[in-house]
């Protein structure tokens, strides 16, 4: 819930929507999540909010997207290069070398060839950049790789997301088998919960850290809040939280669902607002931490730039 709230609040902050919309989105998140949790029954699909028309429309558009749409929305052109700016940053020589070596490995070649039958195992790294992806990239390895699969006119362009896998925050169930490698854990979990996504993911290591590589498809593009009206954004927040609540409920027994519901409704609500204060304060604090860290990074970069200019 906190992670979804942070994503929605960050997206709303970067849109033209008024700040009060964020508060209403968090409110509706609580309602949607709680409804899915309380309405779930073992063995069935539970009670979930009907999908708003705006979500159905966006999903329809996403499924109809082609590579050029993905390129336009993520790298702003259809040439084999990634323009640097606020979303994409230049890499060090070490990063460039390590990522190039990663895509020269037989395992990754075979994986990409399986995703693109008929194009062979020849891979060309056209460009790579550090990807500034909100809270998930702060202090972590996160890269966008513009990759070509195949030769010449038969080459197929694709965008590969490389993301550092971190230690799980949630405790494991007693006696449950869990991979020791965080990247392997993430991939196995994705293949179990969302096979269509998980089958496009591969675990590996980069710069001594576990990473997950995933080919992005056009329909993977995130929901852009600035495409929505204030009312639509609030409806979308409620529906997305309902989906999360449904997923969480399916992993709990009745006692655990009851405890989670009581936690969601416990004291701490203020000024007549329904969202628990712990949810709101967590989202606000995380946004503040992220913004402060980003500005501190910019300050350090400016200092280094001044030193290079003076040298």
Please give the residue ranges for each predicted region.
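Acidic catalytic cores of enzymes that act on phosphate-bearing nucleotides/polynucleotides
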Residues: 59-136, 146-148, 154
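Conserved ATP-binding subdomain of kinase catalytic cores across diverse folds
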Residues: 1-63, 117-303
């Amino acid at each position: 819930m906190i992670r979804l709230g942070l994503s929605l609040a960050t997206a709303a902050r970067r849109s033209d929507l008024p700040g009060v919309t964020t508060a209403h989105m968090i409110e509706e998140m609580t309602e949607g999540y709680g409804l899915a949790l309380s309405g779930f029954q073992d063995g069935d699909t539970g009670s979930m909010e009907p999908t708003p028309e705006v979500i159905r429309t966006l999903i329809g558009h996403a499924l109809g997207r082609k590579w050029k749409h993905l390129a336009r929305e993520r790298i702003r052109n259809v040439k084999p290069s990634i323009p640097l700016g606020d979303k994409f940053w230049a890499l060090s020589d070490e990063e460039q070398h390590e990522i190039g070596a990663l895509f020269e490995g037989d395992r990754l070649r075979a994986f990409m060839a399986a995703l693109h039958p008929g194009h062979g195992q020849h891979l060309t790294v056209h460009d790579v950049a550090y990807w500034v992806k909100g809270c998930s990239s702060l202090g972590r390895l996160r890269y966008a790789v513009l990759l070509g699969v195949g030769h010449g006119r038969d080459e197929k362009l694709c965008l590969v997301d490389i993301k550092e896998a971190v230690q799980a925050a949630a405790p494991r169930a007693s006696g449950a088998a869990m991979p020791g490698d965080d990247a392997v854990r993430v991939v196995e979990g994705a293949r179990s919960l969302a096979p269509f996504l998980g089958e496009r993911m591969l675990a590996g290591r980069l710069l001594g850290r576990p990473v997950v590589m995933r080919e992005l498809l056009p329909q993977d593009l995130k929901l852009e809040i600035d495409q929505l009206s204030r009312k639509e954004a609030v409806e979308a927040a409620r529906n997305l939280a309902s989906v999360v609540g449904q997923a969480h409920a399916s992993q709990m027994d009745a006692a655990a669902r009851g405890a989670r519901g009581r936690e969601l409704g416990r004291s701490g609500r203020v000024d007549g607002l329904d969202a628990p204060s712990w949810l709101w304060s967590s989202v606000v604090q995380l946004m503040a931490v992220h913004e402060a860290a980003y500005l501190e990074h910019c300050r350090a970069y400016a200092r280094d730039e001044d030193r290079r200019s003076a040298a």
